[in-house]
Amino acid sequence: MNRILISGLAAASVALGAAPALAQQTARAQSENAIVVTAQRSGAPMWTIDTPTGTVILVGEIRAVPKSTPWFPDRLEEATKEADRVIIRAAPKFSPGDVFRLIFRGGKFTKLPDKGVAADYLTPDQRARLAALEAEYDKDYDRGSFLMTAFDLLARRLDFDDETTDDATEVVKEAAEKADIEILRPERFRGEDLLDNLAEADPASHIPCLEAAMGATEAGQSIIEARGAAWRRYDVPEVMANPLEVALGQCWPWADNELGTEIRDQWTGMIADAANSTGTTVAVVPLRVLAEEEGVLDRLEAQGFAIYGPLWR
């Protein structure tokens, strides 16, 4: 009888000792779920990775969200303030010396080499399309670097970044700073390395970027609102197929083999590390880096992570 009583008391003490730990786990899970729900109510497409130690929220960001796109940044801000850490993109690190290099070597980045002209590199059809845009906008792109021409078409002629609202990165960064939440970033690229990469690139390597930029500009400004609308309704494949998103993804640095691979490796590694951390991580990642074929989501899935959210391909 005494042994039965002692065994019963021992079992009860174990159960009582486990109760606080179980309560803590339950409270933590409820808190993480609340953060996820609040973040999802912002309207931005996102994915979650649940692990034994916490949750990672991956917010798929597009740059230059049109003001006509009905999303709610304040809800993402609210969720961020309750997170344990955030991961956001890092700006390149330019030194004063890099600025001087750009000034003295500017022509190497803005002009075709050896006094070359566009027809030296483009097919007759490509050159004819460029000529039509030159006539429409009263511009001379004949000597210009294809990358600079593409940027001019997208930013000034298509004017894709006019009348925009806050990017998700800006929202999360400001919220994290106000709430004193840890901010993690991928390693910053040095300005010197970026300038060297651009200077050494074959002009022909930027032709796909130019072609995509011409296609987006020819399609007209309706694609800007269409891209934002697809993003808001979580139609990720449609966003990725939008001519503007295609153009942005075809241009430097994303399309550069060396830089593009490093960018994707950095994001994949940081998110995998976050999945092994305790608590909730909010990561704002460029949508194209997440959702492209063999992108971050594909890589994480291949590593065995269970990913919940909208279809990305």
Walk through the language-model features, giving the residues of each.
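Active-site-proximal flexible loops/turns
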Residues: L9, S68, E293
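Hydrophobic helical h-region of N-terminal Sec-dependent signal peptides
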Residues: L9-A15
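N-terminal signal peptide c-region/cleavage motif recognized by signal peptidases
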Residues: A18-A19
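Structured, acidic catalytic/metal-binding patches in enzyme active sites
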Residues: R28-A39, G43-A255, L259
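A cross-kingdom marker for long, charged
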Residues: P253-R313
